[in-house]
Amino acid sequence: MTVLKPSHWRVLAELADGLPQHVSQLAREADMKPQQLNGFWQQMPAHIRGLLRQHDGYWRLVRPLAVFDAEGLRDLGERSGFQTALKHECASSNDEILELARIAPDKAHKTICVTHLQSKGRGRQGRKWSHRLGECLMFSFGWAFDRPQYELGSLSPVAALACRRALGCLGLETQIKWPNDLVVGRDKLGGILIETVRAGGKTVAVVGIGINFVLPKEVENAASVQSLFQTASRRGNADAAVLLETLLAELGAVLEQYAEEGFAPFLNEYETANRDHGKAVLLLRDGETVCEGTVKGVDGRGVLHLETAEGEQTVVSGEISLRPDNRSVSVPKRPDSERFLLLEGGNSRLKWAWVENGTFATVGSAPYRDLSPLGAEWAEKADGNVRIVGCAVCGESKKAQVKEQLARKIEWLPSSAQALGIRNHYRHPEEHGSDRWFNALGSRRFSRNACVVVSCGTAVTVDALTDDGHYLGGTIMPGFHLMKESLAVRTANLNRPAGKRYPFPTTTGNAVASGMMDAVCGSIMMMHGRLKEKNGAGKPVDVIITGGGAAKVAEALPPAFLAENTVRVADNLVIHGLLNLIAAEGGESEHA
């Protein structure tokens, strides 16, 4: 899985809480000289390397990680009444405890195995548990019951309830999706897999738990402890050791009670925690709907009760998955006039705007990992007169995600050779980023002069448009995040805390921040000078800036430049371009 050595794991454990650590201490953990640490750090996985910040001899990570050291884990386990084992890498933490349970069931009881990486981690229904180092808190433990296996059907929801209690102790509000998923709305925070072994006259339940500690970059519809911690306005960062100790305390107390009294004492609490109680749901097997109805509740065996068209039905977990039934949302009627839903598919986020009578009615956005707000708005606002028109540079897979939320054809518009009286001089218009084209079309909402059109996103684009309607092309450069990331990953000494912009920076962090902004501002001013020369003496050339960093870029341009030229910050420029185009189709056009 990785080629990390014990010294790498020790250093990671020292830094995992996100607090500053002096290089002398880290060097002792790595058994090397402090000046060797930078080269040593380059051996870390790429997603870990970029988290490091250095300042005045101290190292820290910009976010905490779920990484432990054996001694600290042992102390934590003793306080909670558990024996501990730490496996930096293994096939499956459940397999580790299952093997122990088969050999010595008494030893498996209250023995916990924590792992940082699993090659064969799994969830319910054989699904693979995906994770990267440090993103997920993963552990398994054994619990011996003096009961046969068939009497433990409610253990799964009880374990989920214990985890929810623990998270509540830390101020984090969660729900449970039957039978045992920890969720925040539609986003999954964690899952539980329980496997059992019958040995020595006892049933040993092996409880495997995985909780997203930081938001997993490659997993859609996910929540994390760290993001919840910040949403709850808690000071500082979440701590994986505190989280694990709180979980073990609640799991121990709840399972002790469950072993004596069963599920009955927990039923009311579970009903409150159940996200879908009283709501319409679909039950799926292998992706196919096998049943639909309204959740009535869960009984003492952990069995789900549904009210269906055929009457009440009961469902055991097995190979069944539960999903909210969004088809039941009523759709309000709208006037018969044509309405539009305009989409801008950027690299990292989707933006959309509802257009009625030629104006924006509602504007929204969401990351691709959770487009449910778009789906919810579609269910609420759509009718038979809505036409969906979009521009996308995000790739086919993300466009497919958008399509899943909208029950209608999407007209994805490419760049064209000409539109709205503007001629596109790009050599191959089909290769031209459609966002750049619609930014140019949208700029006519704000200026009829020649203008430099700037978009600050994942990439920064700087394009030229003449006053007589010739789009001349332009430049593309990395955005601020990509510039910072490339310095962090590709250099030994420039992975520093974010600095501030100064005329004459005297620290490395400030030099990096100032250099990145100067690069963008310099590119804008270079393009402005070229366009002004081409446009002719005495004729104005405006600057239109859009995107997340637009205001900061406008502020950073030299005062003399701002005094001599018109510089405007325009939100949603692509959507303005789409609106201009469809308005022209209807005989109207937006003007400045």
Swiss-Prot record:
Stretches assigned to the BPL/LPL catalytic domain: 83-259
Disulfide bonds: none
Tagged with keyword Calcium: no
Annotated Pfam families: BPL_C (PF02237), BPL_LplA_LipB (PF03099), Pan_kinase (PF03309)
Cofactor binding notes: A monovalent cation. Ammonium or potassium.
EC numbers, comma separated: 6.3.4.15, 2.7.1.33
UniProt pathway: Cofactor biosynthesis; coenzyme A biosynthesis; CoA from (R)-pantothenate: step 1/5
Annotated binding of substrate, by residue: Y426, G433, S434, D435, R436, T508
Annotated stretches, region: Biotin--protein ligase: 1-329
Residues given in the record as ATP binding sites: E344, G345, G346, N347, S348, R349, L350, K351, T458
Gene3D superfamilies the record matches: 2.30.30.100, 3.30.420.40, Bira Bifunctional Protein, Domain 2
UniProt superkingdom: Bacteria
Needed cofactors: NH4(+); K(+)
Region of interest called Type III pantothenate kinase, as start-end residue ranges on this chain: 336-592
Reactions this protein catalyses: biotin + L-lysyl-[protein] + ATP = N(6)-biotinyl-L-lysyl-[protein] + AMP + diphosphate + H(+); (R)-pantothenate + ATP = (R)-4'-phosphopantothenate + ADP + H(+)
Keywords, alphabetical: ATP-binding, Biotin, Coenzyme A biosynthesis, Cytoplasm, Kinase, Ligase, Multifunctional enzyme, Nucleotide-binding, Potassium, Transferase
GO terms under cellular component: cytoplasm
Active site positions, chain numbering: D435 (proton acceptor)
Single GO molecular function: pantothenate kinase activity
Record localization: Cytoplasm
Family that this chain belongs to: In the N-terminal section; belongs to the biotin--protein ligase family.
Biological function: Activates biotin to form biotinyl-5'-adenylate and transfers the biotin moiety to biotin-accepting proteins. Catalyzes the phosphorylation of pantothenate (Pan), the first step in CoA biosynthesis.
Protein name from the UniProt record: Bifunctional enzyme BirA/CoaX
Encoding gene per record: birA/coaX
